[in-house]
């Protein structure tokens, strides 16, 4: 936004990302699963382009990769994608929606709930019989651990 960009939210998944990017003239799209999509690459996923860009950033900044990653992780610690096998994903989504009704909810891709200092998304996978959970906080690792544990308690199921 600082440089004139406008964020566009898209549903996760290759086909959804490509369609959303084309419909909104998006330059770049990324998923927590480390998929990176580029308009100049026909809105396709590439793992090589991000590494070339990171290498360029390392050269320009003079920082090591561990420093660059450490800065980002300190600002926005996240759980990473946690997969759970559950018997009834619709029931889990409904229960989470009720439990976290006081947060700002969105249903673009599963259930996303945002609070002032943390947020989460839980959705049914497009490719596997699992639910995927991502949790993020603003600089608070303890809150991240507590909220991740709290959400997993509600989601239940088994590790996938």
Region locations from a protein language model:
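Phosphate-binding and adjacent anionic-ligand microenvironments
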Residues: 1-160
